[in-house]
Amino acid sequence: MATQQQQSAIKGAKVLMVGAGGIGCELLKTLALSGFEDIHIIDMDTIEVSNLNRQFLFRRSHVGQSKAKVARDAVLRFRPNINIRSYHANVKNPEFDVDFFKQFDVVLNGLDNLDARRHVNRLCLAADVPLVESGTTGFLGQVTVHIKGKTECYECQTKPAPKTYPVCTITSTPTKFVHCIVWAKDLLFAKLFGDKNQDNDLNVRSNNSASSSKETEDVFERSEDEDIEQYGRKIYDHVFGSNIEAALSNEETWKNRRRPRPIYSKDVLPESLTQQNGSTQNCSVTDGDLMVSAMPSLGLKNPQELWGLTQNSLVFIEALKLFFAKRKKEIGHLTFDKDDQLAVEFVTAAANIRAESFGIPLHSLFEAKGIAGNIVHAVATTNAIIAGLIVIEAIKVLKKDVDKFRMTYCLEHPSKKLLLMPIEPYEPNPACYVCSETPLVLEINTRKSKLRDLVDKIVKTKLGMNLPLIMHGNSLLYEVGDDLDDIMVANYNANLEKYLSELPSPILNGSILTVEDLQQELSCKINVKHRFFSEILNPVLNSVWFLIILPSTFPKLFHFTESRNQDGLSLDIILGFSNVTIRRVLTMFETGRRLTHPLLILFCHREEFDEEKEPEGMVLSGWTPSPATNGESASTSNNENPVDVTESSSGSEPASKKRRLSETEASNHKKETENVESEDDDIMEVENPMMVSKKKIRVE
């Protein structure tokens, strides 16, 4: 039972919720029933049919409407006396600035992507407002508390490559291939070959309620005398053509997004496919055989080959024809199986056609099968548990019970007989570039990299800045904003196409850049290190190690040793004789000619990194290591052995002894897999405690 003090704190609190999806619906309900009376909600998404099975505040009549607005209206029906304000907008919009965040006592996150989470984290730091972060994936979940100066911020620990991928509004605005896979697998395949009575988002073509649902249903119904190929073309034109055109009618949706391209079969396929192949007649497989395939008749043999739009369209039609010709008895009862060759071919083709429409890179059958076979569906119960934990931590924040703050993990299997694992929050990471003043180090080829590379790949992608400003000394090299005149915009755009060493204020080895984001009120320093060796040695450093020995006949040798890290390579050079200069040795490597000097031994060892190889030889470092106070190794080696992970269920251990607790047991980390979240709301950032102390970050 809450004390009078708790009730007063709850009643008078002004709370900001970011996200009104799976966690958000549960959270808003729990906040309202717990006594909170002033709640603001931000969410840019609209309601989809696929949301209805777990986002209980929404009904079928709400499909296409704002999640934030409908959630508000639903809660006000049973708590009419409280104040709830909704915003159907992107939290990164300029109106949600630091001053906007300062009005709240606590911010509660139920977001689905890293970019938005980082943005909210920085605004909370700038506004000095506590943040309660959360996420779920399947049966796993986590809730963390972030208080400026007292606990680590959301970005104090580096986030490993995502093991789960959020599928944001897969039916309307896909941005990744996995979104297209989920659409093809859970919507289109299920609609055509699964339970006909199960509603999904393909039943709704637009937000126009005047459109006939019966007309839409008729598209998916095949009459007995309808030619299979014509039926396939009808489905093709509906889902890839008319549905896309209907989506384009909503101008607000595409205001800041790339507009998709409607695709019709007549523009891609020949008039008739009957003469092109006769697979439905010549196929000798038995009815129901999972190995029936559309590929042989189309001359497609390699599953790792990337199909173009025409090939994907042919596979789409041919696979659909084979389902009706060879597996008709199964239609109406089929579910996707990654071992069903024809199902995988159909889903791959459909996903690739949709990806082509939305400007997303295509994938091979082999790649698509791997993605489609690792779908992790959302669990409503996990969302409810996490929402309750968020409210518990929010109440502690309002009471300022710092000693009682907990980071809580919801586990799939009991650990020490517990499914909920609470631990004390971590101290701020002194090496964090977001909540501390740690300078960054950027190793880059200043003569071959342009300012655009720095802005796009480092400042925006890696540092997550939205409105960056870049200064070198007193020279302003780049800035964005609505208040710039045309001349300034032209000058900054011209700078983007210049190499770093050729800018008005050249960026060279040893240059120190100041990078700021005025919207996030974030500023950091970047020390630039020019990567000279990568210009010449990269082409020859292809093997793991090699040894070159030249004739050694001269006395009085001296040794010069150079150890560097270049593109993941530890390089040791031992030179003999004083007149063997570095330049002459490099000339030998470039031309292939042997020098007449006594000795050259070159040892090369490739280091292993968890992140993907960076483009253009850029490496950003200086902010990724965990603080020594949390027990992480301070070694600079990337090949260090993994540190042991200590779990604490009671939170009684000192902060200096704790480790990052994984959401899953250590045994579950033995096999690295990529999980794909099939829903569109509340994705948990799975953090591997064995990987948080890496020194280098590879630029994606």
UniProtKB/Swiss-Prot annotation:
Cross-referenced InterPro entries: ThiF/MoeB/HesA (IPR045886), ThiF_NAD_FAD-bd (IPR000594), UAE_UbL_dom (IPR028077), Ub-E1_IAD_1 (IPR042449), Ub_act_enz_dom_a_sf (IPR023318), UBA_E1_SCCH (IPR019572), Ubiquitin-activating_enz (IPR035985)
SUPFAM superfamilies for this protein: Activating enzymes of the ubiquitin-like proteins
Enzyme Commission number(s) of this protein: 2.3.2.-
Pathway, per record: Protein modification; protein sumoylation
Signal peptide, first to last residue: none
Subcellular location field: Nucleus
Segments for region (Disordered): 200-224, 614-700
Cellular component terms (Gene Ontology): nucleus; plasmodesma
Annotated Pfam families: ThiF, UAE_UbL, UBA_E1_SCCH
Keyword Acetylation tagged: yes
Biased composition (Basic and acidic residues): 661-674
Residues given in the record as Zn(2+) binding sites: C153, C156, C432, C435
Residues with PTM Phosphoserine: S678
Disruption phenotype: Embryonic lethal.
Broadest EC class assigned to this enzyme: transferase
Residues bearing the modification N-acetylalanine: A2
UniProt-annotated binding residues for ATP: 19-24, 43, 51-54, 67, 112-117
Taxonomic superkingdom: Eukaryota
UniProt-recorded Gene Ontology molecular function terms: ATP binding; metal ion binding; SUMO activating enzyme activity; transferase activity
Disulfide bonds: none
Biased composition (Acidic residues): 675-685
Example GO BP: embryo development ending in seed dormancy
Function comment: The dimeric enzyme acts as an E1 ligase for SUMO1 and SUMO2. It mediates ATP-dependent activation of SUMO proteins and formation of a thioester with a conserved cysteine residue on SAE2.
UniProt similarity note: Belongs to the ubiquitin-activating E1 family.
Subunit structure comment from the entry: Heterodimer of SAE1A or SAE1B and SAE2. The complex binds SUMO proteins via SAE2.
The protein, known as: SUMO-activating enzyme subunit 2
Organism: Arabidopsis thaliana
Native organism taxonomy: Eukaryota, Viridiplantae, Streptophyta, Embryophyta, Tracheophyta
